[in-house]
Every structure is written in structure tokens, then in C-alpha cells.
């Protein structure tokens, strides 16, 4: 097929892309007694904006922290101290796959045509009841790959959706083991329709 031929050439068609906006987030507690020294804004905190009377949802994709400047003003920043915070349009969605027996063909297709593949986060849990997980990294960010590397690749499936692929212990790293749970988190987006927002409200 055209899709498989394109993948053989190292190409995978782009998915929809979430609109992004840069904002400065502040919290003013001047005059408030017993305020905390530091506040945290969790990842996936929601904001909304309206364009032509249509409301769109944006959100953070990482936790942000802010420290009292001494006057009750807090400016939120990311882990690198950057106060120019990026909000992404979209709705967070989660898909889980249970890894079958060795030798079985494992298929991890995300049946969502609105997926922004660039926002994908892949976590592998040892079993369905644990909260601890191993993060997997996009193969595009690999510097060195061996049989123990934990990478994933997203390609287009024949039905037009996107498929998650792992290594086999030889090609591009380690595949999730039998009995583990693969959890995929991503943003479902409307694409360019959400461009142009000016005012964002929590």
C-alpha cells in the first residue's frame, strides 16, 4: 500500500496539530495572610478561549510552580524556570493496551483521527494494579539505541489511524513484556480551527 511504502522510506504522514499559545500565568495574593511560599499548577490544568462564539479548551502539559516574590505575587514557570508558558489546545485522552503472550502479534492502534501524535506520552506498567511505570521515549529523540532501550515509534495504520510500535530487543530497543499494560496519553485536537484566541480563562 501507499502507507507501507511511505513507512519503508522513513516517512509517516503528519497528524492534526494542536494550536499553541504562549502566556504568562500569575497569582496575586497580596494582602492574604498565611499564604504559602510556593504553589503548584498541575499538568493538564484547563483554560478556555472563545473564537467566533465557539469555546475551545487549552491546557498545560506539565506542572508549573510559582514562588512568592515577597509581596504576594506569584509567577508560574516550568521546570527550566521559563515563565513563557505554552498552552496546547485539545482534550486529554488515554488508551490502554494489555500485552499478550510472546510470539503473538501485538497491535496497538489508537482509533482516533483527531490525535496529535506530537503530544503522545507512553507509559508501561508492570501490571494493571500498580501505579509505577516505565516511560518510553519517541525513537526520533534517540541518540544511542541498544536492546535495552525503551523507545516507541508512531506510524500510520492502513485504516488511517495511528499505530504504536516498539522494538523487538534487536532493532530499536525493548518491547513491553507479557502481562504489562501500555498506556498512551495524548491530546485530541480540532487543529487550526482554534488559532486566534486572545483571552484565556481558567
Q: Where in this protein do the model-derived segments appear?
A:
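Signature of Asx- and small-polar-rich beta-strand/turn repeats characteristic
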Residues: 1-202
Amino acid at each position: 500500500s501507499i502507507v507501507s511504502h511511505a513507512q519503508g522510506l522513513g516517512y509517516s504522514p503528519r497528524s492534526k496539530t494542536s494550536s499553541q499559545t504562549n502566556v504568562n500565568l500569575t497569582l496575586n495574593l497580596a494582602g492574604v495572610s498565611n499564604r504559602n511560599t510556593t504553589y503548584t499548577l498541575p499538568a493538564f490544568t484547563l483554560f478556555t478561549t472563545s473564537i467566533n462564539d465557539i469555546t475551545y479548551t487549552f491546557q498545560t502539559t506539565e506542572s508549573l510552580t510559582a514562588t512568592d516574590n515577597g509581596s504576594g505575587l506569584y509567577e508560574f514557570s516550568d521546570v527550566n524556570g521559563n515563565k513563557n508558558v505554552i498552552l496546547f489546545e485539545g482534550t486529554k485522552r488515554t488508551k490502554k493496551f494489555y500485552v499478550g503472550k510472546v510470539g503473538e502479534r501485538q497491535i496497538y492502534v489508537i482509533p482516533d483521527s483527531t490525535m496529535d501524535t506530537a503530544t503522545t506520552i507512553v507509559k508501561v506498567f508492570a501490571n494493571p494494579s500498580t501505579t509505577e511505570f516505565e516511560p518510553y521515549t519517541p525513537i526520533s529523540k534517540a541518540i544511542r539505541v541498544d536492546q535495552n532501550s525503551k523507545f516507541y515509534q508512531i506510524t500510520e495504520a492502513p485504516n488511517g489511524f495511528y499505530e504504536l510500535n516498539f522494538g523487538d530487543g534487536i532493532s530499536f530497543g525493548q518491547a513491553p513484556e507479557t502481562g504489562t499494560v501500555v498506556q498512551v496519553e495524548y491530546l485530541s485536537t480540532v487543529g487550526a480551527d482554534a488559532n486566534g484566541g486572545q483571552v484565556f480563562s481558567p
